[in-house]
């Protein structure tokens, strides 16, 4: 057998041993989750509220505060930027409790390696309300609103995720929201 034939045989053997499907259950789960996130990403519009359930112990505790629906532990609001959905949200940083408002891509926000579920909720916002929502979120982002570890509703200088969403909706809909 000549060198070219031997090389082709080796390449064929190598290619036949490569798997294109995930090898184990965790990889299959992540693959399915990424597919679901991709489908969700295609549905997103400005103003959508995105919810998620992080797989940490702290998220399980936070989730249990909800008396009605314990499906999620964190929330953010979508603004499309260059056709890409960015999720504005507030959470403590990983190394300390002094996190600030941030914007992450939808894929990063819902990362299946760190989260077990996500949901999308859409309010029926007018163009005027959407424009106002963008202004408010961008102002909060520029102000670098800090995470509020005390969960104090009396100030807008510090907020936690669901407080940010609620206060945003209150500004858009006034007191008719609740």
Annotate each language-model stretch with its function.
Residues 20-81:
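N-terminal accessory segments that precede or flank the first globular/catalytic domain
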Residues 24, 46, 50, 107, ...:
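Membrane-targeting and insertion segments and their boundary/processing signals
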Residues 7-13:
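Bacterial N-terminal signal peptides
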Residues 61, 116-178:
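Active-site nucleophile-His-acid catalytic modules used for acyl/amide transfer and hydrolysis
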Residues 15-17:
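N-terminal signal peptide c-region/cleavage motif recognized by signal peptidases
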Residues 54-120, 147-155:
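Glycine-rich catalytic cores of cysteine/serine-nucleophile enzymes that process amide/ester linkages
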Residues 1-4:
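Positively charged n-region of N-terminal signal peptides that target proteins for export
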